[in-house]
Amino acid sequence: MSDDLDVLWISSSPVLQRFDKPLLQYISKDVNVAQWEYRHHRDEGSSIDEAVDLLAEFMGQCPYPVNLAGHAAGGAIALSFARRYPKKVRSLSLLAVASQPANTWHAHYYLQRQLFTISREQILANTVRNLFGEQPSHTTKKLVAVLDRDLEQSPLLHSLFKLVHLPEGGVNMPLMICGSKNDPIVSSTTLQDWSNCLKPEDHLWECPKGHHFFHYFYPQTVGDQLLNFWQLRHLQPMQTSYLVSHHWQN
């Protein structure tokens, strides 16, 4: 790990990593960014706790606290880590994370499977519209395949038989909550539930549009908000910024 790391971005799934790249490339012009990615083998179990343990092993290489950030399930990992290891985290930025952090798109998918007698493929196609908005049919098919793989790779142990929950509440370090006004997974109402545990130095912001992956569609808008938040936390841009990636497996 570099000694001048500013921001560590947490990714929960290799297959969704592509949707983080525009934002990370944009902010890497001003701050030094590393991407930590959780991976597990199909024949092995996975969990948020294991992801946090692996992240802690990686963060043990860093002698100072960093600004931690993540989207959706990646944000849930970042939040869980920040609560367990607060001295390792300078600030926490969560994108499309509900106040109940386990309420990701995976939970919505399994809830629909419980409620409706339609096929897995139909529900995934509906989920594509919820996450990305209306897309051409060929794009929808590709995104259905992406989501199908993400269901297998998620560290959240949702299933048709049980939806898991994670602890709710805030954190000790400065916190930024970001969402999108037209995200049906983490709606504006759901996002406002964070207000009950925000501190004076915390910040809640909504992108005007962009659905669940608003940071993919509007990387500059989202990036500017994050950069402003980090600079308020006394983060000084490095003379030479960069983007690196780290992959950890269980």
Swiss-Prot record:
Pfam family, one: Thioesterase
Family the UniProt entry places it in: To Synechocystis PCC 6803 sll0249.
GO biological process: biosynthetic process
Protein known as: Uncharacterized protein alr2406
Top-rank taxon, per record: Bacteria
Coiled-coil ranges per UniProt: none
InterPro entries assigned: AB_hydrolase_fold, Thioesterase
